[in-house]
């Protein structure tokens, strides 16, 4: 018998995804937007692992490794762009940066 039911794992993944989506829609700071995207990616990775463990397949863990590697690449590129924006505009507010387009 498996320790955690599949429904509980998928419910946790859905809650985490909704938290990330709310953070993406509500927050105006680019750093928090990047963190919200990371939460959403980890929630989708958790759903893959839970579904893979339900049917005793390694596919979920393979997809988890793919999602984590994509999240690491996205985080490094996102943080580099964030640093560039902060050096140029001295703010991380989305509204301020979008008003400064020239």
Curated annotation (Swiss-Prot):
Gene Ontology biological process: ATP synthesis coupled electron transport
Membrane topology: Multi-pass membrane protein
Keyword field: Cell inner membrane, Cell membrane, Membrane, NAD, Quinone, Translocase, Transmembrane, Transmembrane helix, Transport, Ubiquinone
Catalysed reaction, written as an equation: a quinone + NADH + 5 H(+)(in) = a quinol + NAD(+) + 4 H(+)(out)
Top-level division of the source organism's lineage: Bacteria
EC numbers on record: 7.1.1.-
Any one GO CC term of the record: NADH dehydrogenase complex
Any GO MF annotation of the entry: NADH:ubiquinone reductase (non-electrogenic) activity
Residues passing through the membrane, by range: 6-26, 30-50, 65-85
Subcellular localization, as worded in the UniProt entry: Cell inner membrane
Enzyme class: translocase
InterPro entries with a match to the protein in the record: NADH_UbQ_OxRdtase_chain4L/K, NUOK/Mnh_C1-like
Primary localization class, coarse: membrane
Assembly: NDH-1 is composed of 14 different subunits. Subunits NuoA, H, J, K, L, M, N constitute the membrane sector of the complex.
Function: NDH-1 shuttles electrons from NADH, via FMN and iron-sulfur (Fe-S) centers, to quinones in the respiratory chain. The immediate electron acceptor for the enzyme in this species is believed to be ubiquinone. Couples the redox reaction to proton translocation (for every two electrons transferred, four hydrogen ions are translocated across the cytoplasmic membrane), and thus conserves the redox energy in a proton gradient.
Stated family: Belongs to the complex I subunit 4L family.
Protein name according to UniProt: NADH-quinone oxidoreductase subunit K
Gene: nuoK
């Amino acid at each position: 018998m498996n320790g955690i039911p599949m429904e509980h794992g998928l419910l946790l993944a859905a809650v985490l995804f909704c938290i990330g989506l709310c953070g993406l829609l509500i927050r105006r700071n680019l750093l928090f937007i990047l963190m919200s995207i990371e939460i959403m990616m980890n929630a989708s990775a958790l759903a893959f692992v839970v579904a893979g463990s339900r049917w005793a397949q390694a596919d979920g863990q393979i997809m988890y490794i793919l999602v984590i590697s994509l999240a690491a690449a996205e985080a490094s590129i996102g943080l580099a762009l964030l640093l560039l924006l902060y050096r140029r505009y001295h703010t991380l507010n989305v509204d301020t940066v979008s008003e400064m387009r020239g």
